[in-house]
Regions:
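Short glycine/proline-enriched coil/turn segments at helix->beta-strand junctions
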Residues: 46-50, 72-75, 94-96
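A short, flexible beta-alpha/helix-coil linker loop
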Residues: 25-28, 68, 127
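Hydrophobic/aromatic residues within transmembrane alpha-helices
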Residues: 21, 54, 66, 113-115
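Crotonase-fold acyl-CoA enzyme core
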Residues: 4-5, 90-165
C-alpha cells in the first residue's frame, strides 16, 4: 500500500544569491548512493549561486555512510566510499563558499561533510560531532586525516583524529 508521495531526499531553494541545499531522509540522514547522488545533483543545480548552504534535517545533520551498504560486502563499501569521496571533493573544491548548517548530530562521514565546508555553523543542542571510527580502532583514511589537519584547529585536531570526539 502506498502512503502517498515520497518526499525528496534533497531540496534546493534560493534566498537571493545564496542557494540552500537541504538533506532530509526522515531518519538519520545516512549517506547512501541515492543521497550522495542527490546532493551532487543539487550542487550542479545551484552552480550560479554566490554561496551554498548545506543543511540537514532537525537534530540530524548526517549519521555518515549508510551502514547497510557498508555491510553488503567489500565491493559495495568501496563503491559507496568512492562516491562519498567525489562528494567530499566537490564540496571542498567548490568555487564559491560552502557553509554547513549543522542542524544536529554529525558523525563519521557527516563530520567529514562539515570539514569539507568553508564555514560551519551549528544549532544549539546536545548534539555529537565526531569521527567514531577511531574509537573502535579503525584508522581514518588519509584524505580524512589531511582534511581534519586543514580544517580543525591544532588544539582540537589530535582529539578529533585520535579520540574521535
Amino acid at each position: 500500500m502506498n502512503d502517498g508521495p515520497v518526499a525528496p531526499l534533497v531540496t534546493t531553494r534560493h534566498d537571493e544569491d545564496v542557494a540552500v541545499i537541504e538533506f532530509d531522509d526522515g531518519k538519520a540522514n545516512a549517506l547512501g548512493h541515492d543521497a550522495i547522488e542527490a546532493i551532487l545533483s543539487a550542487f550542479d543545480e545551484v552552480e550560479d549561486a554566490g554561496a551554498v548552504v548545506l543543511a540537514g534535517r532537525p537534530e540530524r545533520f548526517s549519521a555518515g555512510f549508510d551502514l547497510k551498504v557498508m555491510a553488503a560486502g567489500p565491493d559495495a563499501a568501496r563503491g559507496l566510499l568512492r562516491r562519498g569521496v567525489d562528494l567530499f571533493l566537490r564540496m571542498y573544491l567548490y568555487p564559491r563558499p560552502v557553509v554547513a548548517a549543522c542542524t544536529g548530530h554529525a558523525l563519521a562521514a557527516g563530520a567529514i561533510l562539515l570539514m569539507c565546508s568553508d564555514l560551519r555553523i551549528g544549532s544549539r543542542g546536545d548534539y555529537r560531532i565526531g569521527l567514531p571510527e577511531v574509537t573502535i580502532g579503525m584508522s581514518l583514511p588519509v584524505f580524512a586525516t589531511e582534511l581534519a589537519r586543514d580544517r580543525i584547529s591544532k588544539r582540537h585536531y589530535t582529539r578529533a583524529t585520535a579520540l574521535g570526539t
